[in-house]
């Protein structure tokens, strides 16, 4: 097991990539502290985690709340004495251009994505420095590299995550802390389906998105979780500041 006896904190576990990654980490032997504002989804993930070789705990709250991030990290460290892996997978999308996006929605998207990366890194990295080792995994998007239509806040936030990831990687490399991003393509998750639902012709938009990938299909959350496992484990010991693209050939096509 690649994460045997490791302690991981994963945000955004109520569904999708966060859930799949948390369950895979547990299956590989980790204790996973689960974080989400959706208590029902988080509890479902906790049940799945507890049916693996690992175990976990549930922490309900807003990832953009710095006090909550600090308190959760302190609780995990108090209980387990360390944090080996931090994965920030919480996210949402409001759609819209820079003209049509409501300022409150813009701020909320950045609070969740960028704040939810910065604040949790800010809380967890000092413990990793004391340990002399740690892995941080952030979630970007292929759209942060390619651009896209009608989703300006989300795409801008994902671009900021890539820049923040690279900055953290350089800042903490000599502390033994690796920081990497995953840039998924369109992954078949509730978040993706909600984004399609904003359009009048949902099936047409789904087909266009599916066919944009060279592989002509959507990705699965479990496929992204495998990339996260690689970055969380010692297998990627010489990898930091990287953006791992898991996009079914979207960017290449």
Residue ranges of model-derived segments:
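Substrate-binding pocket helix/loop in short-chain dehydrogenase/reductase
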Residues: 97-98, 102-110, 151, 209
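Alpha-helical segment proximal to the catalytic Tyr-Lys
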Residues: 126, 170-174, 237
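C-terminal substrate-recognition "lid" of short-chain dehydrogenase/reductases
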Residues: 2, 118, 217-246, 251
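Conserved glycine-rich cofactor-binding loop
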Residues: 14-16
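Residue(s) in the substrate-gating loop at a strand-loop-helix junction
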Residues: 141
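Active-site helix of classical SDR
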Residues: 121, 157, 165
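Short, small/polar-rich loop/turn modules that mediate ligand/substrate recognition or access, typified
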Residues: 87, 173, 178, 239-241
